[in-house]
Amino acid sequence: MRRLSAILPILLLSNFWPTVESLNYKCHNDQILVVQSFGNDTIRMHCQRLDLCGYQKLKCDYDELQPQCGGKLNFVSHVNQKGSTAPVEHTCCNLFNPRSHHSIPTHIGNDCFIYELPDGSSNGKKVDPAPADDAPYAVLKNPAEIPEQFDGVTGYRLRLFLLKNKSPPTLLVKGIERRLDGYRVTICRPRCTSYDKVVNDNEGAEDGEWKAISWSSWSSSSWSTWARHAFNKAAAEGGEAAERIRTRMPIGEKTVAGAAGATGAAGSDKSNINIHVESNGNNNNSFEGGRSSSEKSDGQLNREISGSSEAGAGGKGGAGADGAAGSGAGAGAGAGTNGNINITVHTDGKSGGNAVAVANANVTVNGAGGVSTTGTGAQTGNESGLGGSAGTDKAGGKKGGHGDSGDSGNNKNKDNGKGKGKGKNDEEDEEDNGDEDGNGKGGNGGNPKGEWDDGDGDEDDDGTDGGSKESGNNGKGKGKGSGDGDGNRNGNGDGNGRPKGDGNIKINIHSPDDNDLLEKDENGPNGKGGAGNGNGDGDKDNNGKGNGTGDGDGDGNGNGNGLTGDGNGTGDGDNNESGNGNGDGSDKNSGAGAGTKPENREGGDGNGNGTGDGNGDGNDNGNGSKGLGTGSGDGKGEGNKSGTPGKSDGKEDGAGSNGSGNGKEGDGNKSGGSGKGGAGNGKSGDGSGDGKNNGNGGTGDGKDKNGKGSGSGDNDKSGTRAAGKGNAEGNGKGNGNDGKGSGSGDGSGAGGKGDKSDSESGNEADGKDGKKNEGAGGEAAAGSGGANKGGSDGDDDDVDVTDVEVGTKPLTGTKLEELLAKLPNETADGNATGDGNEFGTVQTGAKHNAESSASGIPLVQARSNTVNGGAPVPPAPGSGATGSGTSGSGTSESVTNGSGATESGSTGSGTTGTGTSGTGSSGTGASAARTSSIAGDAPQAAVLADTPGAAGAAGGGRSNCFSADSLVTTVTGQKRMDELQIGDYVLVPSSGNVLKYEKVEMFYHREPKTRTNFVVLYTKSGRKLSLTGRHLLPVAECSQVEQYTMNPDGIDVAMRESKYAEKARKGECVLSIDESGEVIADEIVRVGRMTNVGIYSPMTVEGSLIVDGVLSSCFSHLESHSAHKLIFDFIYYVYNAFGLLNTNHVDLQPIPTFVSFAQYLSKTVLPFS
């Protein structure tokens, strides 16, 4: 007891001791720590995404465990302190611009100060500031803006607050340092300027400005000990300290370090130099004659070389370089010969001679032309221009540069190539500037003297070895530089005659503010090119010998035929010319046989014996032109006789010249090949080709063109042609190709919808004129066409099945089939009747339709004959002998549509396209019925997006949320769903039609990498909402939704009446937010489908939120918002009571087990099943 009485006073006193809590702030999603306000021993901070100097949506590159965040664009994002006295660790956000150029040129620095928060343990003692001159931190000059000190400080508060306003941030945290007496917080204000000022301002820093307050030069952790007098001293004394803390200048600004030295060119005989010289360093290409002896200045931000002007003497003349940085420009030049160069040079030196020296060139310096230098050079400044004298042929490359022109070859008569090695500092090293071989072994015979000749082997030279240097030709091109000389043309020529050119390079080099660089003019008369790609020797003089096997373009293509080649070849010619020997040559030489040439192309006149078949040649001895088919021997073959007839798949024209009938799908050797629809789809097709499905044309229309055959259907009746209300001719999608080889009575098909957009159109006895047993002939694709879309003018309820990868691109053809093949297959195979339709159609039997009629969702075969609910895809030819025979309009089978109503074929209703088993007189070519896109159930019929198995409409998938690119409104602006975090405040609807911000308490479901299908709702106001089919959405008839908006508790009622999004229909309404923030009834104008990656379902206390401007529920799986709300409230209170709520960032959140269990119970027990 005595001990307890002694301890009790100590415990009571300890309650009055100040306590210091550790710091732990975190800003996610590219947000940084922003100071909202400070003063009175308190700093208020919040997280915000930074808009810096006019640049928005900047991104963070995070560096963890940093003692502070040094750098111009480096700011604090996370703060962590393990204990109240432990050092503070930072996660720094290095901001960058994710868009092009990836910089923020208008941000030129930061003005920073230090704010100290004394520890509360000082117990009211006044904290005396350090003397001003020795203060270890800097303060701004205006005390009214930021107080320099505080009196009577007894404690501190460093707090994180939510953003209350949207004013742009001006104070950013650079670091928080724990000291013995409290915290020291470094705060910076970004300094911005205009873009034009950044680009054009070449002035230095103003006197008296604190250069070091730009944090761009911080490279060490000594930031906390920098003092103001150090800044002033550095600015005054310059030198090394100033260099250490100087402000980094933006790209484009010049410093006072001096003018950049221009580069010099080392020249020699026939040194083909492309020069772009500007002494201010704005040239993007450079080469030099000397070695740099000083460091680059800050102005030299490109790739210039500020070499000394100790120019290396090249073979007969090298050009010197400008002086080193800061010393002006000096140049030395030697005389050269045969260097055909046109150069314009702009210099901008601030001291020195600004001399320019180029070997034997046409030079324009700053607008004045005619400058020619021969070994004279100004020598000014630092190692500038030791004036290269006129070098001899074997002058060593003293202090050689990059050797871009292969100067100073060791051999007197060898041309210079493009040497690659950097020169060495050894004067005796004669191989510095490129290889001794210099790219050519001294050839002759090619370009005339004085023409441009770069040793690359890509000109039309041909020299044969051993030429003189004066003729300016290339040798065989074995140099070790990058030139590959053509030599004897034994290499592989291009085949295509290169433009010959005039041998001169014209170079335009403009002032520093001009972006035009080198322009090489190679336009000249077309040369003859090489003699093919093979080993043929043909050359530009038409002299070719020997045998070759290549084919080229230009002069002679074929092998062995140069232009007057006399070898044997087997290739094809080109350009309307013929060659000698066997095979097709070119260039106007007749061969051993006579031939005809086609239309100025594709093979010259063949001579002698052609050997190819398939593409190109006709029969054995025919000089055929190129055929276009792919079967063996299926060309036009305008040879002696008719060419071999087209085999299995002739593509454009049928068989030989005696054949007729140009069908695109020729069936072998029938005369003309069978047409596609009576006459074929090809060009004319006047033969007696077969009809599409064994009918001989009939009197109706073919698939594309008109067939002129006289074949008839079963009873050769043209039918009544009773069309739907639209398309009176009955020639297409839904109104029946009625007369297409009609069978008995030519049943007019199931009619079509015609012009109306609802499922009732096309019912006006369109098909009643046919007798009930006439199913064999007529209709063709019409009955099923009517079922699919209801005529070309019908309406498919705007249901889009969209591309799997892109997400919004409507599909057609086989792409749709690929997509649908990935979806659940819940019906039987469509080919129940008839072997003629092999595409796979829908079998909408009574069993399946009855099964789906309970929920109003028709089942759709995964592979359908419709594209976007539109025109029918033509089935494969049937096996019958007469009639068009795809499906009649007979009543042999009745089917039930999605609404439970039964339609028979005789009524011609455009709803389900019946007549699935009508047979022709001698064939079964039947087409199964196709399910239409009726207004009521088409969206579910198009894609059952969330049904994982064969459970039909009652099934449910696990992916029932919003897409990743959906937008929600937060207190700081709009966020994508994949950027939303627990703790964010989002805009939600509430009672009284009032909108408010609610906290995201948890994620009901979050799977960023899961791919699933989404329903996309497009509204009249322009909103677009993407959510899974089993997500709850308040949607109803527009009149009802209008009532919701006028009733004070309308939003609550609408949420309770939410239903699955997949049940939304065109013409119904959702609740949206207009531009003024009012809740309105917004009509759905289109229902689409898409696939995307990422599913997200955030939860708020209200159980609802606004996504993409549309009011939506947070729940899915159970079609009852109220039941979900009860479940969520239960889970929330349990989690909250036991401390299980996760307040940290969540990457992956599966559906809660309790929700899955409730979904299971809902099928049998719960009232909302």
From Swiss-Prot:
Gly residues composition bias: residue spans: 312-337, 526-536, 545-572, 605-634, 656-700, 727-752, 775-791, 907-923
Keyword Lipoprotein: no
Composition-biased stretches (Basic and acidic residues): 511-523, 753-774
Annotated CDD domains: Hint
Compositionally biased tracts (Polar residues): 840-855
Sorted UniProt keywords: Cytoplasmic vesicle, Developmental protein, Extracellular matrix, Secreted, Signal
Compositional bias (Acidic residues): 426-437, 453-464, 793-803
Top-level taxon of the source organism: Eukaryota
Location of region: Disordered: 261-338, 368-933
One of the GO BP terms on file: nematode male tail mating organ morphogenesis
Main location: cytoplasm
Database matches in PROSITE patterns: INTEIN_N_TER
Entry's Gene Ontology cellular component terms: cuticular extracellular matrix; cytoplasmic vesicle; extracellular matrix; extracellular region
Residues spanning the signal sequence: 1-22
Chain's role: Required for cuticle shedding and normal alae morphology and localization, and subsequently larval development.
The protein, known as: Protein qua-1
UniProt lineage: Eukaryota, Metazoa, Ecdysozoa, Nematoda, Chromadorea
